[in-house]
């Protein structure tokens, strides 16, 4: 009798252990780990944290049932019949070598299925090279260096328009102003951070300007994180270009604007690449000093109201509680990439990387958080549906000025001089 | 001509600010042979103090720099008491590594509490005010910061060279044991030196809030330039730090404008290497 009781007790224990191990194994298998690799420290940390929050917001939409949101995968819970997306964060500090080693760590040790990253083009380049060698998927939201999709990579996919596309758009806008408003813009200055992103943006600016007959009178690279930008702004002021194209991230952007105010100089028009211009946190600190600058954007609250209402719902429900601000043009694109990847996985019906890559390369994906409404990748990974508009900021509100189809406000041209503000 | 004058003035104003940041480091390095790797983070902390005093209490950095100076004096003393004192005389790299750890702690603490957001005070008394001299535009916040820096530096020079306390500091720097035999409390001297070093960088950081955005990485390049200035000017020499800093400010400004903006730091470090090769103890070292 005692032996039977003891045997029964032991058998029950073993059965419970097996069931727990089994359910743990089942639970472990029901997650898809996605790495997010962004600058969480360093000069671009504000933007990096926003990018992570955007991906987390997208993960919440995918993982939970959201009947109120009309976006792909929002109405169901998880993908592949209940798999949840688990985000694994990593910080590349804005350094290419750290990006490379963190990508290796994410793929090899954390065993992530794919990586979304890296904001800085200089970090995206080596990290995506790691992915390509490992035959793993790399999704890039907002890194804008055109060179990234000119490498012929199979596993790399990028959402944002390139600096080449934006440069063409900036020049088209200048030509429009010259023709319709008799703007008389003939000379151009370019100021840019001395990194992969900045140098490439400057090269594209040069190409686009020379095609349009604009003369480049100042080419001013600077070291990001500089203690001052006095020499740089003095060089611009001495050359006095009609227009300035800027590629300065975060704090450097605010330092540049404040230094121009200090020396009392402004060009007639300033157009900015994917930079501090697009960051609401930077514009909040600049206040009215930031007014009348322009830049390329794939998102603004005003655009979203008109063209992307579901993005506003996602923003209010999952993004703003984390970031204390609306989406910005950069971070939202990182969120888009998780949606696109999740849709591709769902269509593949499995976690077969090659199958998913084939789907990413050939299919078109609806995207509630993309201005064009869809995402489709060319060979090389560039989003053929990438769209950005030119906005002008006034009182921390971005108003769309070009293309004319999206125009919502009349631009202030030329920029109001400092003394008259 | 106005370009030349502008570049000259920019260089001098930057140099004076660099001098104040570097002066405390020079004193500490000269007296105790200790490199404070957290010096840039002390600057960052001072800027945050004045930013938050301005943002929450509405007190302009023109006045709140005093609070930053006092806070950083206390932080400097605490750093000595808690970290440096326990690592001096142990392994050669112990104080260096300890201050490196402190720098990581301060930076990550501020990153965690205040986020990496760039924070810029607006509506300050001197905001955006400039005046013109001979065609050169002078920013009032930068000018006032430079003047304050010069006053503090001159006060420090007077303290070190003309007071009994200053002679005690110099004696401790020259020979600690001999100074103790002369009845100098070297323990208190070390404590004071760390405190003064903190106060100098606290004043600098506090005033910089009038025109520079504060974020957790703001101190990094200032710290590096401070090391260059200390090595160039000579360890322990405040006068050397002042002259070296102005030289660095001018080299940065002239190279940045007349050669190319992107080479300004190349020129700074090149000058440093040349001087060190010719005179390893720096221009005025003890």
Predicted regions and their residues:
Chain A
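Extracytosolic ligand-binding ectodomains
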Residues: 2-17, 26-421
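N-terminal signal peptide c-region/cleavage motif recognized by signal peptidases
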Residues: 22-24
């Amino acid at each position: 009798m005692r032996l039977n009781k003891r045997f029964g007790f032991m058998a029950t224990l073993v059965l419970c252990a097996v069931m727990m191990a089994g359910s743990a194994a089942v639970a472990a298998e029901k997650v898809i780990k996605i790495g997010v690799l962004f600058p969480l420290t360093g000069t671009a940390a504000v933007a990096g944290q926003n990018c992570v929050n955007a991906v987390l917001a997208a993960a919440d939409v995918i993982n939970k049932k959201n009947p109120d949101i009309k976006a792909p995968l929002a109405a169901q819970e998880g993908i592949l019949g209940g798999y949840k997306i688990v985000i694994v964060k990593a910080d590349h500090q804005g350094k290419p070598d750290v990006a490379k080693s963190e990508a290796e760590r994410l793929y090899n040790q954390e065993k992530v299925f794919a990586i979304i990253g890296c904001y800085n083009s200089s970090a995206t380049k080596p990290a995506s090279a790691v992915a390509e060698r490992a035959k793993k998927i790399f999704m890039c939201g907002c890194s804008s260096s055109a060179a990234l999709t000119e490498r012929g990579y199979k596993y790399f996919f990028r959402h944002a328009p390139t600096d080449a596309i934006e440069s063409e758009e900036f020049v088209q806008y200048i030509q429009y102003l010259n023709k319709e408003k008799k703007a008389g813009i003939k000379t151009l200055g370019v100021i840019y951070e001395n990194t992969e992103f900045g140098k490439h943006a400057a090269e594209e600016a040069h190409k686009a300007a020379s095609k349009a007959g604009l003369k480049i009178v100042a080419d001013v690279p600077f070291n990001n994180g500089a203690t001052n930008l006095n020499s740089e702004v003095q060089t611009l002021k001495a050359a006095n270009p009609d227009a300035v194209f800027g590629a300065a991230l975060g704090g450097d952007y605010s330092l540049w604007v404040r230094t121009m105010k200090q020396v009392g100089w402004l060009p007639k028009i300033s157009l900015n690449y994917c930079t501090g211009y697009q960051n609401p946190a930077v514009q909040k600190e600049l206040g009215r000093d930031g007014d009348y600058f322009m830049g390329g954007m794939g998102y603004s609250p005003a655009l979203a109201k008109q063209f992307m209402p579901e993005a506003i719902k996602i923003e209010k429900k999952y993004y703003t509680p984390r970031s204390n601000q609306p989406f910005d043009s950069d971070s939202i694109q990182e969120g888009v990439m998780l949606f696109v990847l999740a849709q591709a996985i769902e269509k593949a019906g499995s976690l077969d990387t090659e199958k998913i890559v084939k789907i990413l390369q050939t299919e078109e994906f609806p995207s509630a958080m993309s201005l064009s409404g869809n995402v489709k990748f060319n060979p090389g990974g560039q989003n053929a549906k990438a769209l950005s508009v030119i906005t002008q900021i006034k009182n921390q509100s971005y108003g769309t000025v070009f293309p004319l189809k999206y125009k919502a406000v009349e631009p202030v041209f030329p920029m109001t001089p400092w003394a008259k503000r | 001509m106005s370009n030349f004058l502008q570049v000259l003035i920019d260089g001098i104003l930057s140099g004076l600010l660099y001098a104040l940041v570097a002066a405390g480091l020079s004193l500490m390095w000269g007296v105790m042979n200790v490199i404070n790797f957290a010096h840039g983070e002390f600057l960052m902390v001072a800027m945050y103090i004045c930013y938050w005093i301005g943002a929450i209490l509405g007190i302009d950095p023109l006045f709140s720099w005093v609070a930053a100076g006092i806070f950083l004096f206390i932080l400097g003393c605490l750093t000595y008491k808690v970290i440096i004192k326990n690592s001096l005389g142990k392994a050669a790299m112990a104080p260096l590594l300890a201050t490196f750890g402190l720098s990581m702690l301060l930076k990550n603490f501020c990153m965690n509490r205040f986020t990496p957001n760039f924070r810029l005070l607006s509506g300050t008394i001197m905001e955006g005010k400039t005046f013109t001299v001979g065609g050169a535009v002078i920013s009032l916040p930068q000018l006032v910061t430079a003047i304050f820096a010069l006053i503090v530096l001159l006060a420090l020079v007077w303290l070190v060279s003309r007071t009994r306390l200053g002679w005690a500091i110099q004696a401790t720097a020259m020979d600690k044991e001999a100074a103790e035999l002369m009845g100098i409390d070297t323990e208190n001297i070390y404590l004071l030196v760390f405190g003064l070093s903190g106060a100098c960088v606290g004043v600098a950081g506090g005033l910089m809030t009038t025109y520079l955005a504060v974020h957790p990485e703001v101190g990094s390049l200032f710290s590096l330039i401070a090391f260059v200035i200390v090595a160039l000017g000579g360890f322990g020499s405040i006068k050397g730090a002042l002259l070296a800093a102005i030289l660095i400010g001018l080299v940065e400004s002239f190279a940045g404008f007349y050669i190319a903006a992107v080479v300004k730091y190349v020129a700074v470090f090149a000058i440093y290497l040349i001087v060190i090769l010719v005179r390893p103890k720096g221009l005025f070292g003890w």
